[in-house]
Amino acid sequence: SRGLGDVYKRQTCSTAYDLDAKAIITVTKSGFSARMISKYRPGCDIIGCAMDEKVCRQLNLSWGVRPILLGEEWEVFVLFERAINACKRDGLLEKGDVTVITSGVPIGRSGTTNMLKVQVVAD
């Protein structure tokens, strides 16, 4: 039997495929979500947004994951906005791109991925 977390990872990849998303953005405390999404080899970029430099370095070893350091933040929608802005800054996303964002709430607790959001990148 698969756990609920695995269902979220598979659904994230399926949603990205169905919407022809440019990227999957995973806001992650430990990097686990980004690593688990990478095992499904989605056909789009995986951007692992971490709050810790050590986690970013570890994500460099995961297939298809592009790590971005966000720094600490405990408000989920502020983190999402910072993640989108960092991706635009680094040339990974531009206006009109569809993204699938995943995270756990409450922020900062490993193993709690329970949120999936589809967002079209604005200006």
Model-predicted regions and their roles:
Residues 1-8:
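Short, small-residue-biased leader/transition segments that mark boundaries at the very start
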